[in-house]
C-alpha cells in the first residue's frame, strides 16, 4: 500500500480540491495563528492535506519533528512559532511534496526575518525513522497531521516517537479514527486508503497501542465527526463512522493506566503566551488563571514534568491515594456532531 499512497499524494493530487472526501478539512484556526498562516507561500498551502491543527502551546525555542510533512505547511507555521533559535525537521516519503517544501525554504526564511533557515526536510518513511540521522531523546515535540493512518506499521512509528522524544516531551498529532475496526474489503481499497479512511484505527485499538508503546495516558485535545460528502463512498462505508481527532501523548515516566486521585491541585499563573485567561491541556482540562484546579496524578505529572511546569503552582504530593479520580471513564471519546466541520474551511 505504500507505493499506492506515494502515487496518490505525488501524482494524483495537485491540490486539496482533488480530494474525494472532506477528511482533509481543518478546524478554524485561533486568531493569533491566522496572520502567520497568511504569510505562508500559496503553493505550500495549496498542497496541504492535513485534518487538524498541530500547533500546541509554548513553542518558542523548541525542537520539533513533523512526521509526513508533505508540502511543509505545518513545518513553516511551526518555524515561525519556535523562532530563529528553534528547529523544525520534516520527514516525508514523496519526492513531489518534498520538492515543493524545499523550493520555498528561502522564501519563508526571508518572510520570517531569519538570518538562517531553521527548518530541514528529510526523505524517508515514518516507519523507518531509525534509518535517518535523528538523535535519540532530541525532540521536545513530535507532530503529525493526518499521516499515521497511512502507515503500514503503526506500532513501529509509535516506538520510534517514544525513542526520539526528550523526557517530558510530547507527541501532538491529528489523525482519522474509526468507531469500529475497518473491514478488509475497505482496508485494501487504494482510494479509501489515500483518503485517510481505510487505514484509520478503531479508536480503542489506538488507545491500547499507545499504552503498549509507553504512552500510558493518551489525552484527547479535540475531535469532530467527518461527514464524507461523497455519496458513492458513503454507500460503501455503510454505518462506519470516522472522526478527526487530535491527541497529545506525553513521554513521562510514572504515568498510570487510569486517573488516580492523590488529593492534588494546580493553579495556572496565566503566563503562557496567547493564553492569559486559561490553559487547555485537553478536552477535559481547561484550567482558568488563578483558580485552584483539582487534578489526578497523571495530569499533575504532565504539567510538572513538561515545558509547562514554570507556569503552574503545584499543591499536594503523592503521599496519600484516595482511589480513582472521579470522571475517569472509557466511553467513546469523540464529539459526534452531525454538523460536520461547522463551516471550517477545507484546505
Where are these regions (language model features)?
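Conserved alpha-helix/loop element of class I SAM-dependent methyltransferases that forms part
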Residues: 26-63, 77, 81
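A short acidic, Gly/Pro-enriched loop at the edge of an enzyme's catalytic core
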Residues: 130-141
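A short SAM/SAH-binding and catalytic strip from SAM-dependent methyltransferases
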Residues: 140-153
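A short glycine-rich, Lys/Arg-flanked "PGG" loop and its adjoining helix->strand segment in the class I
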Residues: 155-170
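Short alpha-helix
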Residues: 199-214
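C-terminal lobe and adjacent flexible extensions of AdoMet/dcAdoMet transferase-like proteins
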Residues: 213, 219-224, 230-347
Amino acid at each position: 500500500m505504500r507505493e499506492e499512497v506515494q502515487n496518490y499524494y505525488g501524482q494524483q493530487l495537485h491540490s486539496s480540491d482533488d480530494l474525494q472526501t472532506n477528511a482533509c478539512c481543518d478546524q478554524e484556526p485561533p486568531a493569533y495563528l491566522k496572520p502567520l498562516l497568511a504569510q505562508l507561500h500559496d503553493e505550500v498551502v495549496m498542497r496541504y492535506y492535513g485534518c487538524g491543527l498541530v500547533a500546541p502551546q509554548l513553542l518558542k525555542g523548541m525542537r520539533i519533528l513533523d512526521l509526513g510533512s508533505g508540502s511543509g505547511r505545518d513545518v513553516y507555521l511551526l518555524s515561525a512559532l519556535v523562532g530563529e533559535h528553534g528547529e523544525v525537521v520534516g520527514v516525508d516519503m514523496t519526492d513531489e511534496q518534498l520538492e515543493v517544501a524545499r523550493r520555498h525554504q528561502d522564501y519563508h526564511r526571508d518572510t520570517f526575518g531569519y538570518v538562517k533557515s531553521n527548518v530541514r526536510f528529510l526523505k524517508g518513511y515514518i516507519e523507518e525513522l531509525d534509518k535517518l540521522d535523528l538523535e535519540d531523546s532530541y525532540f521536545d515535540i513530535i507532530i503529525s497531521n493526518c499521516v499515521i493512518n497511512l502507515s503500514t506499521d503503526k506500532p513501529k512509528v509509535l516506538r520510534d516517537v517514544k525513542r526520539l522524544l526528550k523526557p517530558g516531551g510530547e507527541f501532538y498529532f491529528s489523525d482519522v479514527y474509526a468507531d469500529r475496526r475497518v473491514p478488509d474489503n475497505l482496508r485494501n481499497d487504494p482510494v479509501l486508503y489515500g483518503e485517510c479512511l481505510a487505514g484509520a484505527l478503531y479508536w480503542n485499538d489506538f488507545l491500547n497501542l499507545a499504552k503498549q508503546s509507553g504512552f500510558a495516558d493518551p489525552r484527547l485535545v479535540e475531535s469532530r465527526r467527518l461527514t464524507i460528502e461523497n455519496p458513492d463512498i458513503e454507500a460503501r462505508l455503510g454505518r462506519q463512522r470516522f472522526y478527526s481527532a487530535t491527541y497529545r501523548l506525553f513521554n513521562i515516566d510514572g504515568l498510570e493506566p487510569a486517573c488516580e486521585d492523590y488529593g492534588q491541585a494546580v493553579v495556572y499563573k496565566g503566563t503562557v503566551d496567547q493564553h492569559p485567561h486559561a490553559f487547555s491541556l485537553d478536552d477535559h482540562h481547561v484550567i482558568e488563571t488563578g483558580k485552584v484546579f483539582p487534578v489526578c496524578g497523571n495530569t499533575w505529572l504532565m504539567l510538572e514534568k513538561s515545558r509547562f511546569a514554570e507556569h503552574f503552582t503545584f499543591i499536594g504530593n503523592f503521599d496519600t491515594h484516595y482511589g480513582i479520580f472521579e470522571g475517569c471513564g472509557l466511553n467513546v471519546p469523540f464529539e459526534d456532531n452531525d454538523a460536520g466541520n461547522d463551516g471550517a474551511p477545507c484546505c
